């Protein structure tokens, strides 16, 4: 695999590969979730709607993220080619959401039962780390054990009540991962936009050559 080019950083004073200066677009690489999962997220949000109106919680975006990073606009074409080459040898796989979880800083989420396939998938993206840093961008943030966050924030006055309510709840859904979606937003924007979709090979299919 050829090493991607280093882009000229002269127009961005203060950029440094060693410090990972935070500028450029914010990118996310997310799993395309099936409709039944998105509906289940909406149903969970509906249960929490009264609390949200009271500003006691902040709902999460319904995404399953495996990578985050920053890159400049002029890097995007090379970035897309690079991701296409990485995923060109990756097969899709099945995984299961398995009940609710909670931990400090992550009030409520759906757990993934076996994250090993995600570890292998995210490891394949580590090759991008040097390219991003070499272009003066922040490093790559990979999520080898991703979670589907349901709440970003919960007020301390109701945190115990919310967690107890969902501790008795169950959720189980098997999902086939066949597509990843690259989203981006400018640093001054709140909403992400879809940049590109990447299809994975059929489950169990192995491509014999990376370069054609």
Q: Each PLM stretch: what is its role?
A:
Residues 94-101:
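A short, structured active-site edge motif that brings together acidic residues
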Residues 178-187:
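Short beta-strand segments and strand-loop junctions that repeat across beta-rich extracellular domains
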Residues 28, 107, 179:
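Short hydrophobic/aromatic beta-strand or adjacent loop that forms the aromatic wall/cage
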Residues 1-94, 115-176, 191-212:
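Basic, often amphipathic N-terminal segments
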Residues 101-108:
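Short, basic/glycine-rich phosphate-binding loops at helix/coil junctions
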């Amino acid at each position: 695999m050829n090493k991607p080019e280093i882009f000229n950083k002269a127009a961005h004073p203060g950029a440094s590969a060693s410090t990972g200066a935070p500028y450029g677009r914010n990118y996310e690489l997310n799993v395309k979730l099936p409709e039944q999962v998105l509906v289940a997220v909406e149903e969970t949000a509906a249960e929490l709607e009264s609390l949200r109106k009271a500003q006691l919680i902040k709902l999460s975006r319904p995404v399953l993220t495996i990578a985050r990073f920053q890159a400049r606009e002029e890097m995007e074409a090379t970035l897309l080619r690079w991701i296409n080459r990485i995923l060109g040898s990756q097969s899709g796989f099945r995984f299961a959401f398995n009940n609710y979880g909670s931990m400090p800083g992550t009030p409520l989420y759906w757990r993934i039962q076996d994250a090993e396939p995600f570890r292998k998938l995210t490891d394949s993206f580590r090759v991008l780390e040097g390219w991003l840093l070499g272009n003066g961008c922040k490093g790559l943030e990979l999520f080898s054990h991703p979670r589907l966050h349901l709440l970003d924030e919960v007020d301390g006055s109701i945190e115990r009540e919310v967690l107890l309510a969902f501790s008795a709840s169950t959720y189980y859904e098997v999902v086939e991962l066949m597509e990843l979606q690259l989203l981006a937003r400018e640093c001054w924007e709140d909403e992400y936009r879809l940049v590109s979709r990447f299809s994975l090979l059929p489950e169990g299919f192995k491509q014999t050559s990376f370069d054609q």
